[in-house]
Amino acid sequence: MMKNILAIQSHVVYGHAGNSAAEFPMRRLGANVWPLNTVQFSNHTQYGKWTGCVMPPSHLTEIVQGIAAIDKLHTCDAVLSGYLGSAEQGEHILGIVRQVKAANPQAKYFCDPVMGHPEKGCIVAPGVAEFHVRHGLPASDIIAPNLVELEILCEHPVNNVEEAVLAARELIAQGPQIVLVKHLARAGYSRDRFEMLLVTADEAWHISRPLVDFGMRQPVGVGDVTSGLLLVKLLQGATLQEALEHVTAAVYEIMVTTKAMQEYELQVVAAQDRIANPEHYFSATKL
């Protein structure tokens, strides 16, 4: 059965971020994606200028009411949320999650708690971080913080892999069954590798791949693609190890393709066959 995912995050008309980054790779792995956009911008904000608007929170609810009105909400297998334009949007998204789970009790909520990257110029609206700590985290089935977001969610520093696993389990005690630490950064084993963790109450998997050097301008949307692909693989029945290994390889293929084409925006269309069938392989290690 094809899986249906309601993906609620940002949208850019030019380039790739949020749904504009994740939607196509998720479809390429065989999932139906229902993109619902929290913002519509001309381009992502790290260009330093952009046009567009943040959607009113009620818009999100209205769209989902429309899907419910044609009696299709029960076919939704998961809700994915990413970049929020406001904390109020978050409240509406949790209402949507409750509505989807009422229609399909098997449905999952995957929260990508985007809280900004100060060094990358990514900023979020006031109250969004607090929303994720107080409401998004306990409501989620799967949550995917980077290292900075993990520290905000668990409310203490995380300095190494062992502490990251323990921090992930602190989050699990509050709601989610699965935590993806989607970028270990300085808490990883190695400074010259890109490392991730996938943690449950009784399993922890670590994986690393080479960093792809883009100099000063790192592509945007890597985390959005990572979260979306992991959700698809898990819904399709992959084990934690299989899901982590495929996603790591697929994202690496996108990065390598983007670098080879000397582009700044992720080249998800050019890399599409390698997203489905990666040529590289990275092995996850059980901790």
Curated annotation (Swiss-Prot):
One of its GO terms (cellular component) is cytosol. This is Pyridoxal kinase PdxY. Homodimer. Substrate binds at S10, T45, Q46, D224. Its EC number is 2.7.1.35. ATP binds at D112, A144, E149, K182, R209, P210, L211, V212. One of its GO terms (biological process) is pyridoxal 5'-phosphate salvage. It is an enzyme of class 2 (transferase). Belongs to the pyridoxine kinase family. PdxY subfamily. Pyridoxal kinase involved in the salvage pathway of pyridoxal 5'-phosphate (PLP). Catalyzes the phosphorylation of pyridoxal to PLP. Keywords: ATP-binding, Kinase, Magnesium, Nucleotide-binding, Transferase. HAMAP family: PdxY (MF_01639). Disulfide bonds: none annotated. It catalyses: pyridoxal + ATP = pyridoxal 5'-phosphate + ADP + H(+). It comes from the Bacteria. The gene is pdxY. Its cofactor is Mg(2+). Pathway: Cofactor metabolism; pyridoxal 5'-phosphate salvage; pyridoxal 5'-phosphate from pyridoxal: step 1/1. One of its GO terms (molecular function) is pyridoxal kinase activity. NCBIfam families: PRK05756.1, pyridox_kin. Pfam families: Phos_pyr_kin (PF08543).
